[in-house]
Amino acid sequence: MIVTKLKSFFLALSTVCILMGITWGIDHWRRKAPDEFVILGKVPNFCLTDQHNQSICNKDFKGKIWVVDFFFTSCPTICPVMTANMVAVQNAFPDNSIGIASFSIDPEEDTPEKLQEYAKEKGITSPHWHLLTGDEETIYELANKGFNIYAKSGNTPTEFEHSGLFALIDTQGNIISRKRKDGNPIFFYKGTEKEGITMLIEDIKKLKKQSLL
């Protein structure tokens, strides 16, 4: 009788331990998943106008995974490559579940009408991809201090300067980066290189999976 009770006790104890182990494993994975990324800072506040002449603010991306870049429609160098690669990112998520904010660094020329033409020409179809224009000083402040992605104005298309980098934003409004093998962040994703786009798409998928937990 005592032996039977002891067996029942140890069986129950084993079951509890297994369940605790499974629970710990799930919880550990949830805590560990964000460690794949480094938080670089919070998204700055902004309200600008998109290609549909609608006011778009950072709060409109709340709860979404989104990507940021800086460009201008008359850019003769890296912008066509950047936009084509961003279209590839858009097309990797046909459910339109991610957001994209492309800030024009030539807002005087890039009116909502011109941005809408550019969107049609380049295959921009996602309702959550906003080509943004507005106050020039505000946009350069966002580029150089808000997102820390370099941009410099010019008088002609060849005089404008900007990086080809893409920034990744999580659902909490954090600017994030994946870690290199040495544990240091890559900071941003190279929007002109296939490898950078591949990494970006991989990391968006990881964030999407994490957000479902």
What is the role of each PLM region?
Residues 43-44, 66, 163-164:
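Short loop/turn microsegments at loop-to-beta-strand junctions
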Residues 49-50, 169:
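Hydrophobic alpha-helical segments, especially N-terminal targeting/anchoring helices
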Residues 58-81, 85-86, 101:
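Short active-site neighborhood of thiol/selenol oxidoreductases, capturing the structured segment around
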Residues 118-121, 127-138, 151, 162, ...:
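Soluble extramembrane regions of membrane proteins in the secretory/endomembrane system
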Residues 155-213:
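Thiol-/selenol-based redox modules, centered on thioredoxin-like
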